[in-house]
Amino acid sequence: MISYKKAISLIKKNSITLPSKKISIEKALYKVCAKNILSPSKYPSFNNSAFDGFALSSRETKGLNSKKTKKFRILKTIAAGDNPKINTYKKNSTVEIMTGALLPEQFDTILPVEKVKYFPSKKNPKYIILDKKLKKFEYVRFGGEDYKPGNIVLKKGEQVQANHLIALAALGIKEILVKKVPKIIFFGTGNEIIDYRKKNIPLWKVRNSNNLYFSAFGKDLNLEIVDGGVIKDNEPYKLKKALQKTMRSDIDLFVTSGAISAG
């Protein structure tokens, strides 16, 4: 019998390199990435609002306080996905802006909606009233905060998870290179093994739990598992035949349980 350490060494020494193929990201969940995936662009691709509120120019709020207030005329409402272009901009103007909407070039800060004072009323707002100075870039989410061009989105050898897919889709990456899913056949061995579904079994027998466990464990790792059944100890020819058949098939790995000692 060889040691566990020696067994691992032999497995690594005789391991094979599985081929790679390009697939759509819709089919990539739990597959193993075959090469580093880099961001082709920055994300977000533009500066946008991190809050619902009003976009303003911080320069125009300079010197404001409770005794010195200013009205800002509401020009329009910009929701996420709207064209933010302002055809005619006048000093001391503002736009209502929703979370994720592109920040127009005339503005550089956001006043959250919870802090807004409307004029003449909230039901009929024409202006907002401000009584304090706003800092530049408050509540602004910058383009490239999540990813910059060339950043690693998915590493080689990493298993693709749901959080990777949302990033890949957001960056417009449609396909990635992944490793072929290993196909493994498993055989239980031993004269004592019988079907686990049998209700009453002889005292000297044991129910087959290994095949079910290996199949479930393999599927949990996104491996393709083939249940080869059970081969008796006194049927070595069947084991040999199964091994020969496997070598002629598309099976990548042949696994058996049992036979850990001289017996």
Task: Kindly give the residue locations of the regions a language model identified.
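Hydrophobic alpha-helical scaffolding
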Residues: 1, 18, 140, 204-208, ...
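Generic structural signal for well-ordered, non-membrane alpha-helical segments
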Residues: 1-8, 21, 25, 47, ...
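Short, low-complexity N-terminal leaders and the immediately following helix N-cap/first helix
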Residues: 1-68, 108, 123
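N-terminal intrinsically disordered, low-complexity, charge/repeat-rich segments that act as generic
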Residues: 1-14, 201, 214-218, 253
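A generic alpha-helix structural signal
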Residues: 8-12, 29, 75, 113, ...
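A glycine-rich phosphate-binding loop feature that marks nucleotide/adenosyl-phosphate handling sites
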Residues: 25-29, 184, 234-235
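Short, glycine/charged-enriched hinge/interface segments at domain edges or termini
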Residues: 55-227
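Short glycine/threonine-rich loop/turn motifs
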Residues: 191, 211-263
